[in-house]
């Protein structure tokens, strides 16, 4: 086990490039990599006909030119949508990527990836076999993946289907009963919003051999506080937070 005091800080960029490109798109991954991002957080769903794809929201309206529930559509419809609709820096239409497209890119990219499983228990029956197959077909990409979910069912099932992969449980507050449950599931990390991590809670997580992951890190001051209390994985929407932190420490 790596001692918490010596483990390097991990900066995980949400959506691939934060606010610099349409989230969960190939454009975001390419932009993030070009800016030196080495760890990203993307969101995984499954289409009505069983194709895993990258998309965050349940509904399509916020980021596409369509309306409706994303996972209720077949892949032939989803892949035609513009996933950059309304984004302030989008240079042109961006398609919703299939998981296989992302993993094919990841095979040669020097970057790690957390995939958040955004699926109901019923949808897991479609998603997990397709996910496992894609990982088997592209092992160089698979070794760079870990998985997260706020669903205990999804976390447990991922452990059964994708053996040996890192897993993270998303929680509201990292209280001891939750930490114990996470440890019993065999996950390596628990994640919650930045405001819910205190030094005591980080210490409690370590007692259960769990890494603390913080979401909604809004600025450099947030980052400094979290690092001071012992959080080693920070999830950010703004890549410049890391740059400002690095500058302040040099």
Task: Give the residues covered by each predicted segment.
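Phosphate-group recognition and catalysis centered on beta-loop-alpha active-site segments
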Residues: 1-250
């Amino acid at each position: 086990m790596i001692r918490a005091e010596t483990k390097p800080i991990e900066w995980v960029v949400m959506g691939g490039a934060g606010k610099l490109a349409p989230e969960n798109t190939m454009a975001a991954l390419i932009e993030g990599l070009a800016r030196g991002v080495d760890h990203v957080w993307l969101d995984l769903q499954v289409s009505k006909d069983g194709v895993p794809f990258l998309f965050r929201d349940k509904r399509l309206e916020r980021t596409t030119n369509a309306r409706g529930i994303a996972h209720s559509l077949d892949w032939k419809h989803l892949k035609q949508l513009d996933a950059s609709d309304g984004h302030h820096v989008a240079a042109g239409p961006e398609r919703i990527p299939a998981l296989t497209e992302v993993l094919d890119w990841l095979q040669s990219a020097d970057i790690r990836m957390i995939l958040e499983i955004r699926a109901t228990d019923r949808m897991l029956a479609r998603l997990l076999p397709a996910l496992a197959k894609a990982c088997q077909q592209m092992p160089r990409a698979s070794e760079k993946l870990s998985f997260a979910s706020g669903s205990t069912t999804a976390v447990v099932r991922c452990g059964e289907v994708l053996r040996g992969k890192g897993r993270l449980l998303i929680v509201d507050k990292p209280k001891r009963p939750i930490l114990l449950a996470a440890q019993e599931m065999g996950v390596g990390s628990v994640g919650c919003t930045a405001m819910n991590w205190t030094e005591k809670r980080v210490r409690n997580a370590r007692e259960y051999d769990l890494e603390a992951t913080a979401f909604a890190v809004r600025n450099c001051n947030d980052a400094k506080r979290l690092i001071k209390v012992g959080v080693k994985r920070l999830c950010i929407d703004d890549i410049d937070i890391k740059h400002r932190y690095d500058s302040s420490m040099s």
